[in-house]
Amino acid sequence: MNINEDSLQKIAELSRLKIRSEEKEATLQDFNKILEYVDQIKGLDVSSIKDDEIYLHHENAIRPDLAGKHLSREEIESFAPSFQNGYFVVPKVIET
């Protein structure tokens, strides 16, 4: 399966991306490489793998949620260029 320029344009429109004309060829090549890889994966013989075997040896890779040392208010204040009444002071972003 290959993506042509028309398909790339449709994908860009659907995903609200703007692909500059000088990027189109490289983007097409990248998409097509990804699709070739997906085709390789689709071609693998996985008939010998049972569905439930995938999950049998799975261990939780997430570390335990343990409380640790925390920073004091003074330490936190020292990181900020401006800190007032217990809050970080930042430049105004939204005009009202």
From Swiss-Prot:
Pfam families: GatC. One of its GO terms (molecular function) is asparaginyl-tRNA synthase (glutamine-hydrolyzing) activity. Its EC number is 6.3.5.-. It comes from the Bacteria. PANTHER family: GLUTAMYL-TRNA(GLN) AMIDOTRANSFERASE SUBUNIT C, MITOCHONDRIAL (PTHR15004:SF0). Belongs to the GatC family. This is Aspartyl/glutamyl-tRNA(Asn/Gln) amidotransferase subunit C. It comes from Leptospira interrogans serogroup Icterohaemorrhagiae serovar Lai (strain 56601).
